[in-house]
Amino acid sequence: MRNNMQCTLFFLSCMLAFCVLFARGEAAGQIQDADFSYRGITLGDAEQTLKQAWGEEDTEGTQMVHGIHLRTFTYGDVVVSTTAGGKKVVDISLMGDAYRLRQDVRYGATSSYIFRVFGKAQRQFMDDHTCYVYDEPMNAHRRLVLNLDAEHGALLSVRMTMLPLTEEETEELARSPYSPFCVQDFARDFIEQKEIDVTALPSAAPVRLGGYGT
């Protein structure tokens, strides 16, 4: 009887320790600078840097996102978008099942594992996708968007982006007196697309990339 009690207590102690360690692992998840880079290309890099690193694209095109004119470069299941004016990387979209993120987060990853790596987030519905959206703490204009299977919560596709995610964000960005990296391009494209007089809009001045470097 005593042995059974000791075994039971030992089992419960092990379970408690496991739960504590698991909870700590989840709590430790957080966004890092590396989460806004893929295969050596980071949001904010020059278009030329992309081409030097990845070579010739499979296809090239243009598109408008919330009134912002973009150039797009497709490399297999990866689509990289740059601003048409500034030629800076502002969006990296990962599709298919071959991509790998930090700590091997990939297609099919569960929500619990995503939380362990990136931290917890509330589900949102955006562009016909259920998703988790993570902001970079030091740069609110860089975000990681993880699109999920709506039924099971498994990871489908990924976006690393500096683009506004809604029309409201675009309008706010266009009217902002402050101009973080690439936002000047956004403002001009958006206002011109709305046929608003832009003659009084100040010229873009050299700015710091997210507060780092010159």
Annotate each predicted stretch with a short phrase.
Residues 10-20:
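Bacterial N-terminal signal peptides
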Residues 42-85, 106-214:
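A cross-family detector of function-defining hotspots
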Residues 88-100, 107-112:
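A low-complexity, Ser/Thr/Gly/Pro-enriched, surface-exposed linker/loop concept
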Residues 34-40, 98-105:
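Second-shell loop/turn segments in exported
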Residues 31-33, 55:
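Short, flexible domain-boundary/linker segments around small modular repeats
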Residues 1-11:
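Bacterial N-terminal signal peptides that target proteins for export
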Residues 22-29:
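Sec-dependent signal peptide cleavage junction
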